[in-house]
Amino acid sequence: MADTLGIHGESVTQAVRGAVFLCDAETLIGKADLKKFELTAEKVELTASGSESAKTFYNMGHMSNDTLPEFSLDGGDATNLSTWLEASFRTSYNETTGKVTFSSVQGDKTTLKTIYNAVDMPDNVGIAFGLVKTPVAKSVLILWQDTNTGERSALLLPNLDLAFSNLPSLSTDKFTEYGMEGSIKTSKKLPKDASGKYCSVAIFDTADFKAV
C-alpha cells in the first residue's frame, strides 16, 4: 500500500532535549537498534550484521542548550532553461554542499580529545592540538526528544567529516562551549534516490522509534 499524506499530530515535535552520538563512518542503524537510542544512554551497541562486527555509538553527553545543532546548505540555486518554443521548459539545480555545527559543554579530557583531535601531553596532564584542522570521518546521529509527549526523532549523517570549529567559547552567564563542524558527504551505505544518486542524510520520524 502506497504511503499517503495526512494529518499526523503525533509527529509534531519540539526539540526540548537532545543528544549527539558518534560512531565509525558509514555505520547505519537498523530498526531493531533504533529504539535503543535514549537521551541518557552512554553508548548503544548495534546488532552485528553479516560478517561485520558490532559497532557502537557513543553519546557525547551534555551539549549546548543555547547553541543547538544547526544545518546549512550552500549552492543548489535553480536555473530555468527555455526553448525557442516554450518558456521555462526545464529547471536545473547547481551542486549543493551541506554542513552541520553543534557545541559540547563538557570539558573533560576524552571529549576534548575527540573534538580537537588532540593528543596527550608528555606527562599525561593536559592535551595538545594544532590549529590546522584534520577532519575525522564519523557517523553522527543527532537525537531529539519532545519531553511534553515523549516522542523521539533523529537525523543520521553516516559520512560526516568532523572537526573543531573554534577554540573554547567563554562566558560568565552560560556554560563554556566547544564547537564542532562537519561537512556532509554522500554515503554508499544509504540507498540511492529516485535519480540513482547516493544519499547523504537519513531521518527517523516518531513512528520509526516504535516500529516492531
Annotate each PLM feature.
Residues 1-61:
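Polar/acidic, low-complexity leader/linker segments enriched in S/T/G and N/D
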Residues 47-97:
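A glycine-rich, hydrophobic loop/mini-helix early in the fold
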Residues 77, 104-108, 144-148, 161, ...:
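Beta-strand elements of well-folded, non-transmembrane domains
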Residues 82-92, 99, 119-131:
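Short secondary-structure capping micro-motifs at structural edges
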Residues 88-90, 144, 168-170:
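Beta-strand-rich interaction surfaces with strong enrichment in secreted/lumenal proteins
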Residues 89-112, 173-188:
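Oligomerization/assembly interface segments of phage tail-like spikes and tubes
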Residues 108-159:
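Short helix-loop boundary/capping segments
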Residues 154-212:
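Mixed-charge, glycine-accented linear interaction segment located at domain edges/termini
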